[in-house]
C-alpha cells in the first residue's frame, strides 16, 4: 500500500486536531497571578497544560496496554494490539501538535531540545504506525508519560514560583522515584534489547540510533533535575530563574 494512502493518516490527523482543540479549551482557563503578567510564561503554561493532559491519558493508557498484552514486555518487535496501536497514533499526534505549536509561537530557540526530542520520537513511532513493527517498543517507551505527570507538575509549579509549598517538596521526591521506575528503567531495558537483537536489522539499527540519542538526553535531563531540586544555588541568576523553559 502506498504510504500516502495508509489508513493511519486519518488517525494521526484526528489526534493532532484533538490536541489543537484541547489547547483552545485550556487557554480559556484562569491563569495564576505569576503567569498572566508574562507572555512567555503564559504560552509555556498553556503548553504544559496540554502536555500534562497527554501524560495522564498516555501514561494510564500505556499501563493498560501492557496489562492487556503482557507479551509486549518480551516480544518488543512483533507484539501488537489495537489498544497499543491507537496509543502510538495518539501520542504521535500530540508530538505533531506540540512541534507545530512551538514553531508557530516562535519558541523554537527556547524549546529546541523539545523539538529534537519530538522529531526523534515521531521517527520511532512511525515504524509502528506505518509498518506495524515495534508497537510493543512504542508502548514501553510511553511508560515515560507516567513519570512526565510529576515532571510536568513540577515545571508548572516552578513557573508559578511555588517551589516553597509542601506539594512541590513532596512532588520532587515522588518525581525522582517515578523518573527511575518509568523513565530510566524502561529506557535501559529497551536499549539492552536493541543492542542485542534489533541492532542487526535495518529498521532496528535506525531505532537503536534514536534510542541512544534519547538515552543521552534523558541522562542530561536527570542531571539537571538533581542539580535543580537537590543542589540548588543560593542566589540563582536571571538565567537560572528562567530555566523552567527546559527544566
From Swiss-Prot:
The keyword Signal applies. Keywords: Cell membrane, Membrane, Signal, Transmembrane, Transmembrane helix. Pfam families: TRAM_LAG1_CLN8. The keyword Transmembrane applies. Residues 68-83, 195-201 are cytoplasmic. Residues 40-234 form the TLC domain. It is found in: Cell membrane. GO terms for cellular component: plasma membrane. This is TLC domain-containing protein 1. It comes from Rattus norvegicus.
Amino acid at each position: 500500500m502506498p504510504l500516502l494512502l495508509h489508513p493511519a493518516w486519518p488517525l494521526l490527523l484526528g489526534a493532532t486536531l484533538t490536541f489543537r482543540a484541547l489547547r483552545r479549551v485550556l487557554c480559556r482557563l484562569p491563569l495564576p497571578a505569576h503567569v498572566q503578567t508574562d507572555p512567555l510564561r503564559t504560552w509555556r503554561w498553556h503548553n504544559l497544560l496540554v502536555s500534562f493532559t497527554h501524560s495522564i491519558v498516555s501514561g494510564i493508557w500505556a499501563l493498560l496496554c501492557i496489562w492487556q498484552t503482557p507479551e509486549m514486555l518480551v516480544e518488543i518487535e512483533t507484539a501488537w494490539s489495537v489498544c497499543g496501536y491507537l496509543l502510538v497514533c495518539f501520542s504521535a499526534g500530540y508530538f505533531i501538535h506540540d512541534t507545530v505549536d512551538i514553531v508557530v509561537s516562535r519558541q523554537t530557540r527556547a524549546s529546541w531540545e523539545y523539538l529534537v526530542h519530538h522529531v526523534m520520537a515521531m521517527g520511532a513511532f512511525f515504524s509502528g504506525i506505518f509498518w506495524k513493527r515495534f508497537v510493543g517498543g512504542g508502548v514501553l517507551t510511553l511508560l515515560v508519560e507516567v513519570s512526565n505527570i510529576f515532571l510536568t507538575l513540577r515545571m508548572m509549579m516552578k513557573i508559578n514560583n511555588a517551589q516553597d509549598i509542601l506539594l512541590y517538596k513532596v512532588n520532587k521526591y515522588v518525581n525522582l522515584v517515578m523518573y527511575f521506575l518509568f523513565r530510566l528503567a524502561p529506557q535501559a531495558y529497551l536499549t539492552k534489547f536493541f543492542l542485542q537483537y534489533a541492532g542487526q536489522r535495518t529498521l532496528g539499527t535506525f531505532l537503536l540510533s534514536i534510542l541512544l540519542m534519547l538515552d543521552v538526553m534523558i541522562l542530561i535531563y536527570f542531571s539537571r533535575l538533581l542539580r535543580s531540586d537537590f543542589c540548588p544555588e543560593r542566589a540563582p541568576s536571571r538565567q537560572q530563574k528562567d530555566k523552567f523553559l527546559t527544566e
